[in-house]
Amino acid sequence: MKWIVALLMLPAIVLATPSPDSAAKNRLTPSDWRYATQKVAAGDSAWLGAVPDLALKADRKQADQLEEALATALPINPKGVLAVLHTLDAGSWPEMSGTNIVCTRMVVRPGKAASDYYKATRWALLSEPGGAECLWNLEGVWEEVNQQTNNAE
């Protein structure tokens, strides 16, 4: 009996999770938005492709979450994130920023997490032919943060 109930609930559970297409077309609940940003942060190509559509309806807080997710995905799927950044840089989005913010936001505060992120992202961008601008921004901010840290000591 329990199996029958579980099987009957399965379609409702599956339908409750948004897809990139449905997320781009429909209004998202806060839990759907969290799900979408988690998928973007994981570097999921389908969800990366939905970012420009999500950016159109994002408020400032949601845009910040999307930028954070893109930055997290950068060392995981640099090619996919760079394609999204290229689209964002070429367009006009109410609240979203592109390369200048996403490529640098994880290294603006010194520390081990920033250092680890810098190393992984730098390596990923060196392997990606289209990553020069992002790499240039990343390295510039990283050097500036390190110089400020050294001057403060």
Task: Pin down the residues of each PLM region.
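Positively charged n-region of N-terminal signal peptides that target proteins for export
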Residues: 1-4
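N-terminal signal peptide c-region/cleavage motif recognized by signal peptidases
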Residues: 11-16
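Extended alpha-helical scaffolding segments
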Residues: 45-48, 60-153
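Hydrophobic alpha-helical transmembrane segments of integral membrane proteins
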Residues: 7-8
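N-terminal secretory signal peptides
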Residues: 17-65, 150
